[in-house]
Amino acid sequence: MNVLSLFDGMSCGQIALKELNIFIDTYYVSEIDRFAIAQTQLNFPNTIQIGDVRKLNVLDLQPIDLLIGGSPCTQLSFAGTRKGLCTKENIEILSLDQYIELKEQGFEFEGQSYLFWEYMRILTEIREYNPNILFLLENVEMGKKWESVFNKAIGTQGIHINSSLVSAQSRKRIYWTNINDGNIPQPKDKGLLLRDILEDEVDKHFFLSEKALKGIVLHKERNKEKKNGFGADIRNHSDKSQTIRVGGKGVYDLVSVPSRKVI
């Protein structure tokens, strides 16, 4: 099986396929974050990195059997700006043909969520030589309007999965797939909370000063004024995290520890 993973991150797709004992002939990855790339190559040294999704030509690759990816969600998330897929001039992008036309005309795009259309471009190009290509796309829960745009573009209805049932995060997600004809059940609740995953011993440099904490609170207030819901939430050990991040900019995962500052 030849696999192409877009927006690959640390290559969780390879972890899942390995757990399922699915043999991979070639695993192509489109990722631009150097830290994510380094982690992937450490865990899976045979991975073939092919760079920016916007420059990807499927004809340069071996025939693809499985396409997976989770395109950026910032402009779609209820916690974000909710501008959707649009240009910097706020022209909404409602189809792949429209996206390609705007791209050829030199328009610049708002944020990164528009990269969904690059996933669709690549899926469409693969379908030309492999109509039976298996695909899986993940994104955040979004407004009905944009979910309908995704459904129409990809040709299947999104499946709502409550990923918080299997993690210590509040993660409701939508998946689009033709694997198993899209018959994907909800996972069983594992009852995971922060106390189940946090380390007992934490180095002191991970604890925030009063000054740093005030700065983070002010940052969230400024985002709220801009109608952008992204910002830190303080949770305790009996909660689920808003989101658990590895690296990246900003601090969202704050946990209150008794007798200590926030971590």
Q: In which residue ranges do the predicted regions lie?
A:
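Conserved active-site and SAM-binding loop architecture
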Residues: 1-263
